[in-house]
């Protein structure tokens, strides 16, 4: 190996040895506690299918919420 390559290798090894561990073991803990988990709205199941909705409304799913909504007509 040439002296330039050896010097480069030595420099890279020096930089690697100086890096902080990725795990963050040397970092101090942040003060305080985590706040309580935010309340999510309860899952509401107003309908199971379109036929359980009044008139022309359709049963629409938004996450865990099922509700009857007026349909949209596209031309």
From Swiss-Prot:
It holds the Pfam family WAP. Disulfide bonds join 43-64, 47-59, 53-68. Residues 1-24 form the signal peptide. GO terms for biological process: antibacterial humoral response; innate immune response; venom-mediated disruption of cell wall in another organism. Residues 23-42 are annotated as: Disordered. GO terms for molecular function: serine-type endopeptidase inhibitor activity. Expressed by the venom gland. Coiled coil: none annotated. It is found in: Secreted. Belongs to the venom waprin family. Damages membranes of susceptible bacteria. Has no hemolytic activity. Not toxic to mice. Does not inhibit the proteinases elastase and cathepsin G. This is Veswaprin-b.
């Amino acid at each position: 190996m040439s002296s330039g390559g050896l010097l480069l290798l030595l420099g890279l090894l020096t930089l690697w040895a100086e890096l902080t561990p990725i795990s963050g073991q040397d970092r101090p803990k942040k003060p305080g506690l985590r706040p309580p988990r935010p309340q999510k709205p309860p899952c509401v199941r107003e309908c199971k299918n379109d036929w359980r909705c009044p008139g022309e409304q359709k049963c629409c799913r938004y996450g865990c919420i099922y509700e009857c909504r007026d349909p949209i007509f596209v031309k």
